[in-house]
Design a protein with these regions (language model features):
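Extracellular and analogous surface-interaction loops
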Residues: 2-10, 60-67, 370-374, 423
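Noncatalytic modules at the cell exterior or secretory-pathway interfaces
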Residues: 10-13, 61-84, 425-430
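Beta-sandwich interaction modules
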Residues: 45-67, 77, 417-421
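Surface-exposed beta-strand/loop patches in noncatalytic accessory domains
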Residues: 18-57, 400-402
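Extended, charged catalytic domains and RNA/DNA-binding interfaces, predominantly
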Residues: 70-73, 85-452
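Non-catalytic, beta-strand-enriched accessory regions in extracellular/secretory proteins
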Residues: 1-22, 26-29
Length: 452
């Protein structure tokens, strides 16, 4: 069955259905490209399949989508002499290979409930520099994607982003493995790596010409080219560069229209001079609304839970309308994120700290912005679900006069309400909990208040 592929197509998806299966009718499918070459053959095994330059449904080979006449290959190995079958094929053209442009038939929803979901936004497999022990522990090898995902499931993560350095080759593995791993969302991603800094692009599949990153203007233009469809966060912004960590220091500057987030903790560097917390807070004070995130930057899934940069620690709790790629990316961009630095392996249902603000009949979640008249009362509600006594700290700009003793103890499961008057300028508040040794265990993103 011929069909005409226009120019500018980044992905082809074919959805088929046919009648007569109760009478043992079988229809097989395959695909032939514009050059009359076989792209793949799935027989009667798959009724929906997709391909792009970077990934394809198993049975099909990834390839660039050239314009011209393609053919849906149809075989009928069995149909009874007196039977008829109605065949319908829907063909979808996407402008790019990225998930944001995929048709709904490809959308994976692991959980349809609106709730907090926990995951790791920075990890590597053998598609870049991730390694692990071989099957018989004879040597270290590029780590297979499935092994990283298995460890993420073992750690009870709801989602995992594999962010490989300047390559998207893992996309084909994720396309194959996502149906099997039906209780964890696999996010496509890239660690865009240059001598001017590293940045994660969550939701990116298409190639980015990292050679353009050899100049700073090229680096920024590459970030801007993808920023509308993905979540871009600066990685380890104050990490030293040079031989210590090539290109790790952020030199991209701010304001930067391509960036929506800052990785304020990479591995276990929260509380060290390499943490990006102060870097992020200074940007808040300058008026930049950027989501704080964290990432393990794991390069070996075999690491013990208490090792540096072990998979799933630190983690990000994301309040999303469902557990799908589009919903997680949307919530990351909106700042609905709590960062968890604790070493509590049992925490799988809710973040250690939650915060909402009530302004009249309006309720603001973490990451939300609200217009508030001068002098209006804001009720700030903070709840901890931790199993141990903790200390609460609140942070805001100088205009927000919060009558609260920072470091006050919180009992397990305690909820407190703090009343605040809207000051004469726009403000924000974020919260953190620490242990008795003042180690940061969790922190929220801000709620923003704009003077009405």
């Amino acid at each position: 069955m011929p069909f005409d592929v226009p120019s500018g197509v980044g992905r082809i998806t074919i959805e088929t259905e046919y009648t007569g299966q109760s009478e043992r009718t079988v229809v097989d499918f395959g695909l032939i490209d514009h050059a009359d070459k076989l792209v793949g053959w799935s027989g009667g095994n798959k009724k929906t399949f997709t391909l792009s330059e970077f990934d394809a449904t198993p049975s099909y080979s990834p390839r660039g989508i050239s314009p011209g006449i393609w053919h849906l290959l149809i075989g009928v190995p069995n149909i009874r002499p007196d039977s008829t079958s109605l065949l319908k094929a829907k063909i979808y053209f996407s402008k790019s290979a990225d998930p944001i442009d995929e048709p709904g038939v490809l959308r994976t929803v692991i959980n349809s409930r609106t709730q907090w979901y926990r995951g790791d936004l920075h990890a590597h497999s053998g598609h870049s520099d991730g390694t692990c022990a071989s099957a018989h522990h004879k040597l270290m090898v590029p780590c297979p994607t499935y092994k990283v995902i298995e460890k993420a499931r073992e750690r009870k993560l709801d989602f995992l982003a594999l962010t490989e350095h300047n390559t998207g080759s893992q996309a084909n593995s994720l396309r194959e493995l996502q149906p099997f791993f039906d209780d964890i969302l696999l996010l496509s991603g890239r660690e865009l790596t240059s001598f001017y800094g590293h940045a994660n692009a969550i939701g990116l599949v298409q190639n980015i010409d990292f050679q353009a990153n050899s100049a700073q203007d090229g680096w920024n233009s590459q970030l801007i080219s993808v920023s509308n469809s993905v979540f871009v966060s600066v990685n380890h912004p104050v990490r030293p560069g040079g031989e210590f960590c090539m290109g790790c220091a952020w030199l991209g500057g701010f304001p930067n229209p391509a960036v929506q987030g800052i990785e304020i903790a990479n591995g276990d560097d929260m509380g060290t001079r390499y943490s990006g917390l102060d870097f992020w807070e200074k940007l808040l004070e300058l008026g930049h609304k950027l989501t704080a995130v964290a990432g393990s930057d794991n390069h070996n899934p075999d690491k013990d839970w208490y090792d540096w940069s072990t998979l799933g620690r630190p983690s990000n709790w994301v309040l999303a309308e469902d557990l799908s790629q589009s919903a997680i990316i949307k919530s990351l961009r909106q700042g609905h994120v709590v960062l968890d630095f604790s070493k509590d392996e049992s925490r799988i249902h809710q973040p250690p700290i939650e915060m909402i603000a009530k302004v009249g009949d309006q309720v603001a979640q973490i990451g939300d912005s609200r217009l508030v008249p001068l002098g209006q009362t804001i009720d700030l509600e903070i709840t901890t679900s931790d199993n141990y006594p903790r200390r609460l700290f609140l942070h805001s700009n100088e205009a927000m006069n919060i009558q609260y003793p920072n470091g006050r103890g919180l009992s397990p499961g305690e909820k407190i309400i703090i009343k605040i008057k809207m000051p004469n300028e726009s403000s924000w508040i974020w919260a953190e909990i620490r242990d008795e040794k003042k180690n940061v265990l969790a922190l929220t993103n801000p709620i923003y208040f704009t003077l009405k």
